[in-house]
A protein has these predicted regions:
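Extracytoplasmic/periplasmic sensor domains and loops in membrane signaling proteins
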Residues: 87, 119-158
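Bacterial N-terminal signal peptides
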Residues: 5-14
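A short beta-strand signature within small-molecule sensing/ligand-binding domains used
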Residues: 159-167
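Juxtamembrane extracytoplasmic/periplasmic/luminal helical "stalk" adjacent to the first N-terminal
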Residues: 17-70
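Short amphipathic alpha-helical segments
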Residues: 79-91
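Helix-start (N-cap) segments at beta->loop->alpha junctions
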Residues: 181-194
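Short hydrophobic/glycine-rich mini-motifs in sensory/regulatory modules
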Residues: 170-179
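Short N-terminal helix-loop-first-beta-strand/juxtamembrane motif that initiates sensory/input modules
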Residues: 39, 43-47, 93-114
Length: 194
């Protein structure tokens, strides 16, 4: 009888507990990623980001040689100090979440409107947008919105994925890129292990 009474009491407490106290994982995940993107927008140095891709890499990015289909990739080069400094900042930002996440850097390509490049991806190699092996790709409307307006945009186009895009500013206040704070509902730790 005591057990039945105790069980009934517990069930009543669960039934009347406010629903807002324990948000759904996707709601919690979205909020944490929005916070990371907000902080990252202030912490990532746009002046340093603009130095990452070297002039040589920019020169060869759109060159096509029928004798060398990997010309652009073979000549991709970065400024080590700028790259490592920014990558460490992005990695630290990803540790602000209570779940596995990544913070990636995307930069528009000067002289090629509508094109964007993932300059740095992080340890889990998660991105809702990046196509493996591509040096650059067409800019998505959500990315254009961030680069044009400076507003953060949350994207959940792929099932189970959440990305929050936020602007990266240089010292003049210009938007020079964007970060993608990203995670997914079910993470497979071995998915990207080659």
């Amino acid at each position: 009888m005591r057990i039945a009474c105790l069980l009934a009491s517990v069930l009543m407490l669960v039934a009347v507990a406010p629903a807002g106290e324990n948000p759904a994982p996707s709601s919690s995940m979205r909020q944490e990623l929005e916070n990371v993107a907000r902080v990252g927008s202030v912490m990532v140095d746009g002046d340093v980001c603009q130095k990452i891709v070297t002039p040589l890499a920019k020169e060869y990015m759109f060159k096509v040689d029928p004798k060398d289909p990997w010309l652009a990739g073979d000549n991709y080069d970065v400024d080590d100090v700028a790259f490592n400094t920014t990558k460490k900042t992005l990695a630290r930002l990803s540790h602000l979440t209570s779940f596995p996440s990544d913070v990636n850097l995307w930069m528009p390509i000067d002289g090629h409107p509508g094109k964007i490049q993932m300059v740095i991806r992080n340890k889990n190699e998660m991105s809702q947008f990046w196509r493996w092996g591509d040096l650059y790709q067409d800019m998505l409307p959500s990315m254009e919105t961030v680069l044009r307006t400076g507003q953060r945009v949350t994207v959940a186009d792929r099932p189970g994925w959440i990305s929050v895009l936020a602007p990266v500013y240089n010292s003049l206040g210009d938007i020079v890129g964007l970060i993608e704070a990203v995670s997914r509902d079910k993470m497979d730790a071995h998915e990207n292990v080659k």
